[in-house]
Amino acid sequence: MSQRVSYYEIAPEGMKIMMDMEKYTKQSSINRTTRELIKIRVSQMNGCAFCIDMHTSDARKMGETEQRIYCLHAWNECDFYSPEEKAALELSEHITLIPSKRVPDELYHRVREHYDEEQYVDLVLIINQINSWNRISIAMGNRAASK
């Protein structure tokens, strides 16, 4: 991995906060498969090769299929994502792109058909966390390395 500065050494308190949030999201009410799909999709949208590489690798290790990983950028045209996953991915895209001042009521209600209040909050935190990691990684010049 190549990076511009050693941000874990320069800002240990800030990175501890990021890691604490990561720990929270891993223990959240959202299942691991959905969390990884969100992380991959948001990283694709943000163009973070380092995070795409990391999270596709993590997804494969947990048994995710190549088909679902490869087609994630076109999830809304596929029948092999669950309605819950599709709702989470739609919310992920909306929050990542921020096309308006708020999440539309229609989208909120579609997501809430599959997730309770706690899960909705957890989804938003997971989406925001991976967006933060993407921006840190891109700004610091992290690159996906060959294996």
Curated annotation (Swiss-Prot):
It holds the Pfam family CMD. InterPro entries: AhpD-like, AhpD_core, CMD-like. GO terms for molecular function: peroxiredoxin activity. Disulfide bonds: none annotated. It comes from the Bacteria. This is Uncharacterized protein YdfG. It comes from Bacillus subtilis (strain 168). The lineage of its organism: Bacteria, Bacillati, Bacillota, Bacilli, Bacillales. The gene is ydfG.
